[in-house]
Amino acid sequence: MGSLALEAGKIYGLVGPNGAGKTTLMKCICGLLRPDGGVLEIDNQQVEVANSEILSQVGTNFINSDSLKGFSLEYIYNDHVFYHRLKKSFTLENLLDEVGLDVNKKMKFDAMSLGMKQRFLLGLSTIHKPSLVLLDEPFNGLDPDGVDLFIENVKSLSNDRALIISSHVLRDMETFLDYVIFIEGGSILKMKSMFEIRKEYKEGLKDYYDEQKQKCN
């Protein structure tokens, strides 16, 4: 795996063919998997599976939705606050408002649409103020209005933290990314700024992605 240094306040898109290792890389970063080699650090501390202190600096949407069935949004929020030992200065109402969900806090998680679940998990992933947020395929289930709202949420959330987003929806991604990371075979092959991509490629991110993919064949 190649070297990669992330900057707070920037949004990184993780792209690559199916099976390239995008989700695996993100799970290694948040301590769910051990990397085969190399070292991962967050705020100059090495990421380890059992290091709860450093892993608390990471927010993710890697939550098994099935495990939340039957629970209300209020219960899930309170459980998250308790786990991260947070003060309730940022309330559930604040969270719902931030991600544009006009729902009752007693609503069951499984009663929401897939898009609503995605937005709720986005808000939940950041209430403990992590320095790094990882979002895997966050556009799944979002209608066009939901995508627009999600993009606005992401922009506001990236002010003081780094975000890594993995998605196959390149057209939506290129509207807000700062950098694109291309991965294949579990290795980071290249990182390029969206500014450069827009200048060099007529069709933007799609052309860049196709070129990098062709080089791997």
List each model region and its residues.
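Catalytic Walker B motif of ABC-type/P-loop ATPase nucleotide-binding domains
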Residues: 133-137, 142
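Conserved ABC transporter NBD signature motif
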Residues: 38-49, 53-54
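Helix-to-loop junction immediately C-terminal to a conserved catalytic motif
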Residues: 30
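Q-loop/switch helix immediately C-terminal to the Walker
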Residues: 69-85
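The feature captures the beta-strand-to-loop junction immediately N-terminal to the Walker
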Residues: 12-17
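Conserved ABC ATPase "signature" region
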Residues: 78, 89-104
